[in-house]
A protein has these predicted regions:
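N-terminal cap/lid segment of alpha/beta-hydrolase-fold proteins
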Residues: 119-152
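Conserved alpha/beta-hydrolase
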Residues: 179-196
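Central antiparallel beta-sheet cores of small beta-barrel/beta-sandwich binding domains
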Residues: 21-99, 106-108, 112, 142-145, ...
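Alpha/beta-hydrolase active-site loop
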Residues: 204-224
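Accessory cap/linker subdomain of secreted extracellular hydrolases
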Residues: 257-364, 397
Length: 448
């Protein structure tokens, strides 16, 4: 009888603990399972907290390498609707009614419908710590998060830079977590002009953005948990220009990771990318050439503006007149050309960024560098860019260069299917494993 009473007491305490953790709501807690469509599984973890009458829902999608994605929560009767907006305008939605330890229902996203089935589970053991930080580059204040392994002392570290457009730190959180799992700290921050960072994105030159990354390195050098001589800079896409430029600017950068980097200038890369988007939309090569030529002429006026060439205004008016002729053309929106250029001169920093030539920078690099691409990248010209970068590194006699190209991987590190059947977005996690393992090997080298 005594044993029975003790067993009952332990069970009651466990039930009370679960009741407390779930905030007296059938939805709150940690849920683990998957979305399923036509036999294809897409793993999902949900962490849902209730405070008062409101919920906070965070979703992890391990197959897409997406972590901590915030969802809004609505309730109608016993049915809950979790929703997250998407750039396409069509949100990702979970809708269902939890029953005890099971939460299942309908799912929609990416233009598809499916079902989801989740079970209540114990939350995974946390392997990292994080804290909000801020650092300065001149008049610009950059807000970020320092993510470090939960256990241990001095860590090597990586400053993670951004792609194009005003990016916030959340988009790089999963990359930071990959590093933390292997004992490396990472600083992610809101790009200038985004999130809680001050400054203006559009007015920034490539040098401005690289100096922001260097400021992050200098900040990390002062942190007690960071080994000051073992700090590198990593970047994806536009970050593949920023990271190596930061290493040329500062001897404090111990190594560089350039993912999906373009070996050609941003203006040429933009023309290449837009042409590929138009091909995907089914436009003819003749139409694509017309749009590409217009874009090249538009960029040429930008160079004129940068050089204070008085012919710039006249040429921009001429291009505006041509664009007016095509205002009803079905390809104009796909070409992403402005309908009118009057009074729309870009700031000088944006023009300097547009015509940034990367080869001289690579020639000056002296630190270990990892170059990683996916061979199905349609945003940057991989083979052309790889040739340019490696030639420049050879000219500069950089002794420590590693190159990896992953098959069937696109610019977003998403696996490109070899057949035509639909699948959930899946990231090639081997891509990130290669990056982290290379970093671990370099940090073991006493010379950096």
């Amino acid at each position: 009888m005594k044993i029975l009473f003790v067993t009952f007491s332990i069970a009651l305490l466990g039930a009370l603990a679960v009741f407390s953790q779930t905030g007296n709501s059938p939805l709150a807690g940690f849920w683990q399972g998957a979305v399923e469509k036509d036999g294809r599984i897409w793993r999902v973890n949900l962490t849902i907290e209730k405070t008062g009458a409101s919920f906070k829902a965070l979703a992890d999608f391990p197959d897409a390498d997406g972590y901590g994605r915030e969802f809004s929560v609505g309730q109608t009767g016993e049915t809950f609707r979790l929703e997250r907006p998407q750039p396409s305008g069509v949100p990702i939605v979970f809708e269902g009614a939890p029953r005890g330890d099971v939460f299942k229902g309908s799912w929609s996203g990416f233009g598809q419908t499916a079902t989801f089935n989740l079970k209540r589970a114990a939350p995974p053991e946390k392997f990292y710590r994080e804290r909000e930080v801020a650092f300065k580059n001149g008049d610009v204040t950059l807000a970020g998060t320092l993510i470090a392994p939960l256990k241990g002392g001095k860590f090597g570290a990586v400053v993670i830079t951004h792609g194009a457009t005003p990016n916030e730190r959340a988009g790089y959180r999963s990359w930071a977590l990959h590093f933390a799992r292997k004992g490396i700290a990472a600083l992610v921050y809101d790009k200038r002009g985004a999130g809680r960072s001050t400054g203006e994105t559009r007015a920034a030159s490539m040098e401005d953005l690289a100096r922001d990354a260097v400021a992050g390195v200098e900040f990390l050098k002062l942190q007690p948990e960071i080994e000051s001589r073992r700090i590198g800079v990593a970047g994806h896409s536009q970050g593949g220009w920023i990271a190596p430029l930061a290493s040329v600017m500062s001897k404090s950068v111990a190594f560089v990771i350039a993912s999906a980097a373009s070996g050609v200038s941003p203006d040429r890369q933009s023309i290449y990318h837009r042409a590929n988007l138009m091909r995907e939309d089914g436009f003819s090569e003749e139409t694509i050439k017309l749009a590409s030529d217009l874009r090249a002429r538009l960029y040429a006026t930008g160079r004129m503006l940068l050089e204070n060439d008085p012919r710039a205004a006249r040429e921009r008016r001429r291009i505006s007149a041509e664009l007016e002729k095509y205002k009803d053309a079905p390809w104009l929106d796909a070409a992403a050309l402005p309908p009118n250029l009057d009074n729309d001169n870009p700031p000088r920093g944006a023009l300097e960024l547009l015509f940034f030539e990367p080869a001289p920078m690579w020639e000056k690099m002296r630190v270990p560098v990892l170059l990683v691409w996916g061979d199905k990248d349609k945003v940057v010209p991989v083979e052309e860019g790889k040739t340019i970068i490696l030639k420049a590194l050879k000219k500069g006699a950089n002794p420590d260069v590693t190159v990896k190209v992953f098959p069937n991987v696109d610019h977003g590190v998403t696996i490109v299917g070899t057949d035509k059947t639909w699948d959930f977005p899946r990231v090639d996690l081997n891509y990130y494993d290669a990056i982290v393992n290379w970093t671990v090997s370099k940090l073991k080298n006493q010379k950096i």
